[in-house]
Amino acid sequence: MTIKSRPTPKPLKVAIIGGGPGGLGAAIEFGKLDYVDWTLYEKKPQISETGGGISLQRHTWRLLELNGAAKNIHPDDFFRSPDGTSGQQRNGRTGKLLEQSSHPADTPPQQLSCRMVRAKLQAALLQDVDQSRVKTSKKLTSILVLPNGKVELSFEDGFTDDVDLLVGADGIRSFVRSFAFPSHKIKYNGQSAYRTIIHRPTAEKIDGIPQSPVFWQNTGGKYVFTCPLGGDDFEVTARIRRPIEGQHHVSWGRPFDFSTIAPEYDEFCEPVRKVIQLAAQGETQEFALFSGPRLESVISHGALALIGDASHPLSGAFGAGAGFALEDVYALTRSVDWARRNAEGLPAALGLYDQIRSPHYRDLYGVLDNFAALNSALLAEKLPVEEEIEERVRRAGESRSTWMYHYEIEKAVDKFLGATGEPGQVASVL
């Protein structure tokens, strides 16, 4: 009796668009699946990151441990407050401490939140990526879903590729998202952030600048954020409302002469003014802040999946974008692997991914809606300036949600798949 062997399934060809933390994380995780033939396409000439610092929250650290990149981050690369606190809120006009946050008591020491230069996180991820599969100077210009279900990609230099799965990791102004959901629009929200990295030893000579992540709050959406980073780096980020009309706004960092708007911070307390003066002498990058409504789905055409800022245009509202992107990657790659092991097709894998992640983003947008309502109610009271600042911090603190920093995507995925490996119906797991 002859037993026929099952035909070997064809490799799954995957294109990842974008070389940020989400795209690199996807490259790492897809690289662990021996049946996946993946390529990462980055439009810039090299994998690089712009901007100042980035927060690694508890969930981000856990995901870096899961994908293996945590080992590439040296303690000198990041800053943690020596007193064990996680951050401060201060009145930017007076310097008065209004709120101080601490880590939950059960946080493992290696997962305490920290702040580091964005490029160092990217470098840590890149170390675990097969760089022979990374193609730079590849700007995606066209996407076409073929009758056979494959996706045809065309790039600015004339190169083309046909893939089974297209992963959009191309950021807040995602080309892949625009193709998948052409009616979804993002827009400039009226605020811009100015990020500068200055010399830490010089900044630490300023009396009144704490060794902690500090938001120096003011009114009208204006604030300054200061924080040491790893090594000799110190971050200064200033946010302010800018004119919407008559300006060309871009979401990526572009050089900016910060001295031209530094006087707008003269109402801040002396330590902040001195830090602003240092920033005005440094190399500042301007980031116009864009955001958009929640996507009802993060998949399309049975062959496209969005991850990171492409899937949730939140404009950095939670300071945890890298963690969210790595959660997306974890859920997507486990969903793909589940479908493969259970002889299901790619549409089933993407449907599973969507069922895991879309409710999570629904809950995150719900948090933002609550904050918007709080802010509107506060503004309607027309309080004196000092009282408005204190009330905003107090009310935000009382209603603050931190569950997203302790969310365990691996448990959510396991619960969703169930002990038998069958998909079930479940809401987002907090």
Regions found by a protein language model. Name each.
Residues 69, 88, 106, 111-116, ...:
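Conserved FAD-binding catalytic core of PHBH/FMO-like flavoproteins
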Residues 15-33, 41, 167-168, 282-372:
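Conserved mid-domain beta->alpha element of the FAD-binding
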